[in-house]
Amino acid sequence: LAGVGLFAIGALALAGCTSGGGNNGDGGDAGAANPDAIITTNGCEPENPLIPTNTNEVGGGKILDEIFAGLVYYDAKGAPQNDMAESITVDDAQNLTVKLKKGQKFTDGTEVQAHNFIEAWNYGAKLSNKQLNSYFFEDIEGFSYDADTELTGLKEVDDYTFTIALNKPASDFALRLGYSAFYPLPDAAFEDMDAFGQNPIGNGPYKIASDDAWQHNVQISL
């Protein structure tokens, strides 16, 4: 695969590189992060457009994990911690209730709501969409490898709450919800998914820098 450069611009890019104490030990200020700093890292050209349910390799995954956020993220010990989710209640090994934090936004300014997860997962699971990560949804009621179907196990309760019904007990299902296949998609994605994959709108700490930020086989700027 061709090598590409990944550029991240802004204070968040330095968050992992600066001291958490804010003091240099002699009473002076250690200095604030530079919001105009540019961090450059090596990567490889994504094999596919940047759609979470169709990305299963490192080149694209590395970028998706910066521009999207899921229901949970995994801490340094690999344990899930709530991100977009306010709470995930496992009613039993086959039924879950997800409540979202209010006020979370995509970079186009629209709010992240329950339907953004439901529609994204249905898109990923639909046979005719031929998504590489469709198997992530196989435990949800309504999933089929043989025909286009709706994930009937996903029900919107209100703008910030939805339920998940599984077709069989899966005690570890809640632990999987930080995987990129489970990221939400904004309404705009469904207007033109091909175009969206070239310039995705996410809900994570970074966004694609401009319409032409992805220079294929060269670099991508966030």
Labelled PLM ranges:
Residues 34-45, 95-98, 117-120, 162-164, ...:
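Short, well-ordered beta-strand elements
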Residues 1-8:
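N-terminal export and membrane-targeting signals
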Residues 86-132, 163:
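Aromatic- and charge-enriched surface segment that lines or borders ligand/interaction sites
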Residues 42-92, 201:
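N-terminal lobe/hinge region of extracytoplasmic solute-binding protein
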Residues 89, 134-187:
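Surface-exposed binding/hinge segments that line
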Residues 17-29:
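Bacterial lipoprotein signal-peptidase II cleavage site
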Residues 170-222:
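Gly/Pro-rich hinge or "lid" segments in bacterial periplasmic/extracellular proteins
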